[in-house]
Amino acid sequence: MRPWPGHRWTSQKSSSVANWPPCTAPRRPTPRDTSAVWTVSPKDSWGTKPVDFTACDTLYDSLITRRVIPLAQKAVTAGLLPDRALELATGITEDCLGPATIPVLVHGDLWAGNRVVDSHGYSWLIDPSAHWGHPMEDLAMMALFGGFGPECWESYDYLPVDEDLIPVFQLVPLLVHTVLFGSGYAPSTLRALEASH
């Protein structure tokens, strides 16, 4: 990942992140391209929890079918979430993911804890779960645990961010945290599942 100077997320520094050109699939798929590749990650887990990053033809299959529903099933089976959580997960439709878009390379685990500052004052993004995904995956993760100041968010003003989409793109990290760390994450996960419809 590229570094930028400074210990704080200021508009100058964060805009360098916001203005990085999106890295898209080599053949530049179109939003309606059914052969566009979604996911494909060198990792097959999120932390210690297995997560399916198999290449898929659609965002829905990649995000909902292969990640959200299986993780919801694991959480329900473990007694960490009520049965209703799986019903909510399986009730998410393709329309709930917003307008069609092409896959871009995302960090995949972009929270403030995955930013380190070196002895020269440069910030580095570490521990990626990089894959071909939706840009909202990183923005939703940034919003989930905080740590990014208003200057950082102002750098993204040019993006057509639909805040209604944030919950659905927070589901994978919330479900992973529920499965890994227990039912303390259940209320937030259920709220995100309900808001994803």
Label the predicted regions.
Residues 4-7, 111-112, 129-132, 173:
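Short, solvent-exposed loop/turn segments at secondary-structure junctions
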Residues 1-58:
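ATP-binding pocket architecture of kinase catalytic cores
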Residues 177-197:
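ATP/Mg2+ or Mg2+-diphosphate-binding catalytic cores
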Residues 59-61, 73, 102-105, 112-167, ...:
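Active-site Asp-x-Gly
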Residues 41-93:
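Active-site catalytic-loop/activation-segment of kinase and kinase-like phosphoryl-transfer enzymes
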Residues 24-28, 160, 179:
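Protein kinase-like catalytic domain
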Residues 168-177:
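Short helix/strand-capping connector loops at secondary-structure junctions
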Residues 78, 82-124:
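A mid-sequence, solvent-exposed acidic-amphipathic segment
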